[in-house]
């Protein structure tokens, strides 16, 4: 028979019971390492987590289709082929991400970081058509955008990926010419149209204060985040 509690006995009060439940869940799922949907660390750290989290098996061959200086892979021991259109970065392969020099089903993972810095005045060093090897110029009336790159890249990424392969895309929305460019939405639509299944989205938040702009008046919120989009060459994500 249960002992009856005395009216003078102090009753234990748990201030945050949900924390106690979560602690028990963590102990019972010791092998489970959740990936947060908001990330404040570096891209290299996040990529390493995603490469452990999303592929069904450990990827043997990875393509970074826009490797630039290779900052995503600093300290990494993974087998990564870095491609860039600019030979000054000394990539493994000099090539155009809209027309890749690889055979069908060559990679387990493709990583893509498309340009998101539009033309800025008369400074030629900031001309994205020169810096990124773009052939087509978007219209000033549309505020300049890079959306014409997405369909041909997605077609090539789908071709060079193996079955159930993963596409990771880091992408940022931006404002140019007072026009908001919904880059992440346009990329998702382009990838789905090619045959990819859109599986996940991680918001990467930039640390540090927002820099003071040179403009007197702002019409849009300042961008302080970007997205890592996850796609699979499959009909389902799991």
Each language-model region and where it sits:
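Class I S-adenosyl-L-methionine-dependent methyltransferase catalytic core
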Residues: 1-238
